[in-house]
């Protein structure tokens, strides 16, 4: 867990805010399964960050050489690269830390262009896509950073074909009420 500090003040994370908004999201799922899913997703995020920062000519070969990805992770990375090409995704920043005043902080996955339009993209490896959750997540990231044209989820479910899904932007008034901002 990351502790978000701003001038000595501990800030909530976007994940903590969402856990309060969706308290039953993972109800009934055993901890060991949640931990395994989190580990898998974290590794996919790390591999994507490495690909985007190192820009190897042969990304899959590079990841195989320096890491130990599973067969499923390799397939997810192939899907990532396919979607990146299909939607002309240009990654400008990855794993960018953002802070909204003294209310919250978080790490947005990808800031870039999708078909030449500015976007925030969250990468998910979940079995089912929860677009409402991702809408709130990306809207909070956008409010902490700067406006973009569109918000997306790059969904890479384990063992299945990936998708780039546009998600709705949540109204700023709703977000400010959620975080307790009075203005």
Each language-model region and where it sits:
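Metal-dependent nuclease catalytic cores that hydrolyze phosphodiester bonds in DNA/RNA
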Residues: 1-105
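Nucleic-acid nuclease catalytic cores
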Residues: 96-180
């Amino acid at each position: 867990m990351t502790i978000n500090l701003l001038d000595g003040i501990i800030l909530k994370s976007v994940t903590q805010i969402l856990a309060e908004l969706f308290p039953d999201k993972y109800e009934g799922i055993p901890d060991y399964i949640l931990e395994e899913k989190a580990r898998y997703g974290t590794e996919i995020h790390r591999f994507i960050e490495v690909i985007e920062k190192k820009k190897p000519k042969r990304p899959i070969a590079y990841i195989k050489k320096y890491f130990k990805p599973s067969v499923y992770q390799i397939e997810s990375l192939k899907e990532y690269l396919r979607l990146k090409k299909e939607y002309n995704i240009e990654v400008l920043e990855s794993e960018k830390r953002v802070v909204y005043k003294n209310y919250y902080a978080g790490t947005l996955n990808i800031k870039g262009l999708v078909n030449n339009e500015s976007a925030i993209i969250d990468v998910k490896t979940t079995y089912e896509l929860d677009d409402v959750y991702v809408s709130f997540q990306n809207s909070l990231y956008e409010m902490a950073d700067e406006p973009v044209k569109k918000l997306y989820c790059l969904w890479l479910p384990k063992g299945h074909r990936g998708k780039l899904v546009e998600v709705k932007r949540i109204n700023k008034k709703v977000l400010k009420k959620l975080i307790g901002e009075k203005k």
